[in-house]
Regions:
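Surface-exposed, low-hydrophobicity beta-strand/loop segments enriched in small/polar/acidic residues
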Residues: 1-144
C-alpha cells in the first residue's frame, strides 16, 4: 500500500492572513481530534521586523469551545533579526495531547510581524483514507 499525506491526514487553514501587528494574540479555528492522535500547526510568516518575537502555541481541551482549555508546555518561537524570520515557517507538533480539541494561537510581540496564515495538519488517523475538508479546493496523488 502506498502511503499518502492526502489520504492519511487532514489539512486545514486555521488562521487566515493577518496584516502586520504587534503585542497581540491571534486565535485559529478549533480542530476536532476525535479520530486522530496528533496535530501539527504550521505558521506561515511574511515580513517580520527586527526584534519581533513570534510564538506559535497550542491550546487544548475536551470541550468544543475550549472552555476547559490550557496551553501545552512546548511552543515554537522566533526572535527576528534583519532577515531570519522573513517568509519562514514556525512548526509546532502536538503528539497525543490527550485532549479532543486543539487551537493554534500565534502571539506577536515587540515589533511588527505579518502572518500569511496557519495550517493545521491532523494525522495518525484511526480510519483511513481520510477526506479533506473544504479548505482544500483540489488535490491529487501522483504515483510513478
Amino acid at each position: 500500500m502506498i502511503e499518502s499525506v492526502l489520504k492519511a491526514s487532514k489539512i486545514d487553514k486555521v488562521l487566515i492572513a493577518t496584516a502586520d501587528g504587534t503585542d497581540d494574540s491571534l486565535s485559529g479555528d478549533i480542530l476536532d481530534l476525535q479520530d486522530c492522535d496528533s496535530v501539527t500547526g504550521i505558521a506561515i510568516l511574511g515580513d517580520v521586523t527586527t526584534t519581533a518575537v513570534v510564538t506559535l502555541k497550542a491550546y487544548t481541551g475536551d470541550e468544543p469551545a475550549l472552555g476547559d482549555g490550557a496551553y501545552e508546555t512546548v511552543t515554537a518561537t522566533v526572535t527576528a533579526d534583519a532577515t531570519s524570520a522573513d517568509n519562514k515557517l514556525l512548526v509546532l507538533d502536538v503528539i497525543k495531547p490527550g485532549k479532543r480539541y486543539c487551537r493554534f494561537d500565534l502571539v506577536r510581540a515587540t515589533a511588527n510581524a505579518v502572518v500569511d496564515g496557519v495550517i493545521g495538519l491532523r494525522y495518525i488517523f484511526r480510519t483511513i483514507p481520510t477526506t479533506q475538508g473544504t479548505d482544500v479546493v483540489d488535490s491529487d496523488i501522483n504515483v510513478n
